[in-house]
Amino acid sequence: MSSSAMEALHALIPEQHQLDVEAAAAVSSATSGEESGHVLQGWAKRKRSRRQRSEEENLALCLLMLSRGGKQRVQAPQPESFAAPVPAEFKCSVCGKSFSSYQALGGHKTSHRVKQPSPPSDAAAAPLVALPAVAAILPSAEPATSSTAASSDGATNRVHRCSICQKEFPTGQALGGHKRKHYDGGVGAAASSTELLAAAAAESEVGSTGNGSSAARAFDLNIPAVPEFVWRPCAKGKMMWEDDEEVQSPLAFKKPRLLTA
């Protein structure tokens, strides 16, 4: 290598160092390869006005850019893989079946709560027993019917008789209305004395059957009692009631006169 080439190389080293610093700053600020290329091209165009680059300088600059550009290569972010959500399973605790929702599980559980039809029992499978005829049962009920009819006939055939005139009436209300005439005197005026005596005797017999009757006591309770009193003499010649105060004589008491000769 000639001395002129050596001098040119030594003069190129400081300039190359400055170029490396500026290129590194430009590459670090760029976000992509194209933007860094545009910046370097603009920077190279500005520097061409000062001095023409040689082929060796261009080659060295290209190698430097390639070496630095490989280190700053940015890897594209890989798309995240979204896993499909696993559907939740709702399992029946009775039969073990799985369902996609809780509502479906609830509807299935209602089928377990419904009572299953019970199998037919032996009593239901047994043949039916033949029932006796209705005509065989009816005769047994006839005596009761006849007895009730007899009692009703006896009640209807009862005779209501007046104890005063011995008349008969079909009902008790008619007999009561008839007896009211006896008490008012309408029938008693026309009745004979014998009938009245018989009625009085019948009433006395009815009254004697009761406790404490007027016939046994020989007095009538409707008549006021006669007051009982006893006279007793007093020492002074006055009459007094037994339980009352002294009764004064209506006449004035006269003193005895003394006769003088």
From Swiss-Prot:
Keywords of the record: DNA-binding, Metal-binding, Nucleus, Repeat, Transcription, Transcription regulation, Zinc, Zinc-finger
Zn finger residue spans: C2H2-type: 90-112, 160-182
Positions of the UniProt region annotated as Disordered: 26-51
UniProt xrefs under Pfam families: zf-C2H2_6 (PF13912)
Cellular component annotations (GO), alphabetically ordered: nucleus
Location(s), subcellular: Nucleus
Function, in words: Potential transcription factor which binds the nonamer motif 5'-CATCCAACG-3'. Possibly involved in regulating transcription of the histone H3 and H4 genes.
PANTHER family named among the record's database cross-references: C2H2 TYPE ZINC FINGER TRANSCRIPTION FACTOR FAMILY-RELATED, ZINC FINGER PROTEIN 1
Name assigned to this protein: Zinc finger protein 1
Species the sequence originates in: Triticum aestivum (Wheat)
